[in-house]
Amino acid sequence: MAHEILIAETEAFLKNVAPETRTAIISAITGGKSACKSAAKLIKNEHLPLMSGEATTMHIVMRCLYPEIKPWKKASDMLNKATSSLKKSEGRDIRKQMKAAGDFLGVESMMKMRAFRDDQIMEMVEEVYDHPDDYTPDIRIGTITAWLRCKNKKSERYRSNVSESGRTALKIHEVRKASTAINEIAGITGLGEEALSLQRQTESLAILCNHTFGSNIMRPHLEKAIKGVEGRVGEMGRMAMKWLVVIICFSITSQPASACNLKTCLKLFNNTDAVTVHCFNETQGYMLTLASLGLGIITMLYLLVKIIIELVNGFVLGRWERWCGDIKTTIMPEIDSMEKDIALSRERLDLGEDAPDETDISPIPFSNDGIFEI
């Protein structure tokens, strides 16, 4: 998660850069060591259209991610100038706290407790830039993320842990990640056409976000579109979860429980939850698989006991005849009256008579002239 927040804050820092340049830098950061080294070399040789501050910041980010990248004199001079007013005792204290922080959250809590000034933050950045091998990747990522967050904070108003631009960039990243997992989910939910349509929408939205990310006018529209796509992705993910519970309950219980089956379930659950963009960790996925497995076993036992009870009631206690009579009465409630009518019709045909009157009604008194007589 720390790496994703770093990417989001980096993208937020580059919101005023040309979309093609921003895409190239983010792709290099997420593309591995070789891609990042190539991008750092391009930045150092000023082959990318970046301003001086943007170029040095991106080089610092890339070197802290991959210490194999050689330092750039321009970035080192900028850091030395920013920390020139800091006392040596403060620098030693900061370095001790950084090594004791342990991880990304430790760096965050450290900065919040100390309420660091700009020169103190720059001292941390200078440490991870000049001596990256002395610190763990979590410390380096946490330091750079906090630094970028402070830089983004100066250009906008926000009160959350992630800057507003960083939060939007994080949502865009989640939409991109969801679009890559939709194809895997389509096979589980049986919604191939809907999944294909949703994937096209997410890809179009990602392209739109890439070109209009730095625009304050387009931000509300982008967030509304992202929210709509996230809702549909979440709905498909929930549907896939329901399908998975059914599959696990009725297919895995017919096979002996083994580690192979559990790993298969874990893979399905991880692929499914990638659509809702909140991936299970291994423990949660394992426990959820065991819960579904237990639910399937209980369901099978209940059905088996129910079938045995019904067989005993039918063969031993002779209740099936009564059930058949109840079913017959329920399906054809007027069968008795129909049999009586058929018998009466046959009797009349045999006697050759018309149907007798069922009520004793005397004829109406009319005269020969058709006048009613009282």
From Swiss-Prot:
User: Which domain of life, per UniProt?
Assistant: Viruses
Q: Lipid attachment points, S-palmitoyl cysteine kind? A: 324
Query: Which Gene Ontology CC terms are recorded?
Result: host cell endoplasmic reticulum membrane; host cell plasma membrane; membrane; viral capsid; virion membrane
Tell me which positions the record assigns to the signal sequence.
none
The Phosphoserine modification is found at: 337, 362
Q: Which InterPro entries match?
A: CM1 (IPR004271), CM2 (IPR004267)
User: What family is it from?
Assistant: Belongs to the influenza C protein M1 family.
In Swiss-Prot or TrEMBL terms, this protein is called Polyprotein p42
What is the originating organism of this protein?
Influenza C virus (strain C/JJ/1950)
Q: What is the lineage of its organism?
A: Viruses, Riboviria, Orthornavirae, Negarnaviricota, Polyploviricotina
